[in-house]
């Protein structure tokens, strides 16, 4: 890591183990230890600024958010290893902020667009197999972030050197599944290829949802 950041003025730390599947140890190694290694290398090599890619999951507490901002505290009721380890990693990064190393954290949510190998491929695979499910009535509101928006935000954060400040990042307003890009894409593919309509399922209470995840 030292060799990778040597002679660099700025570093964008965007690597992480995302998703909700995998052993706890792997999330710790990549998200927490990996961030610690990046911070240590930046300090050792005299890097001037570090932009850390975080996630809104670090403040999720099981409730819906509307108009949330960076004043929300970290969650303490984690639903997955990803959220918990990313919260710890964000703290590691922000605590390193100093006059020597300017640090900020951004929290883009559900990044999509060219190069996506995480969100849309899985949604399309489930739809193709006729196994896509919609939890609730399909009107759930979720902020998403196009990859171009995320990239612009990282560059803007670097320019502003927002030391120790995490900005919620997402669409200009929440979108609903039925009117989102994913909904339009799925409708077009269903009509063209004859895929099954996604099956709505009742929204389970939170404890039942956790049990299902396990």
For each feature predicted by the language model, list its residue ranges.
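NAD(P)H-binding glycine-rich loop region in Rossmannoid oxidoreductase-like domains
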Residues: 1-30, 41
